[in-house]
């Protein structure tokens, strides 16, 4: 639904942030920095986004299939002033994409990190 939405997945099977090794935490910090710098360069503004990590429930049960991941949901659509808003048909029916995920990913990949 969000044109520049990003899903981050650990390469190795990890279920929680504390389960990451030191080098894995460093790699996560690096990719978070690289992604947010590219977001900021996309429209040359501090790029707004909502981000969250998904970890297993903490109810004491085992969740061996759970895989740590994070979602970024940036609301900007085509420029620094055009935002994507969820409206009735997207909330209650079929999501609409103004930009394909492939073209959004290509635009982010083409941006310099620095």
Task: Place the predicted regions along the sequence by residue.
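HIT superfamily nucleotide-processing domains
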Residues: 1-114
């Amino acid at each position: 639904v969000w044109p520049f939405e990003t899903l981050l997945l650990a390469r190795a099977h990890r279920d929680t942030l504390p389960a990451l090794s030191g080098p894995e935490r460093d790699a996560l910090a690096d990719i978070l920095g690289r992604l947010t710098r590219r977001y900021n360069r996309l429209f040359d503004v501090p790029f707004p986004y909502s981000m969250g990590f998904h970890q297993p429930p903490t109810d004491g049960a085992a969740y061996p299939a759970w895989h740590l991941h994070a979602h970024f949901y940036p609301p900007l659509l085509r420029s620094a002033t055009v935002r994507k808003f969820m409206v009735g048909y997207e909330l209650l029916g079929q999501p609409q994409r103004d930009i394909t995920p492939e073209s959004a990913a290509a635009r982010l990949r083409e941006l310099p990190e620095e």
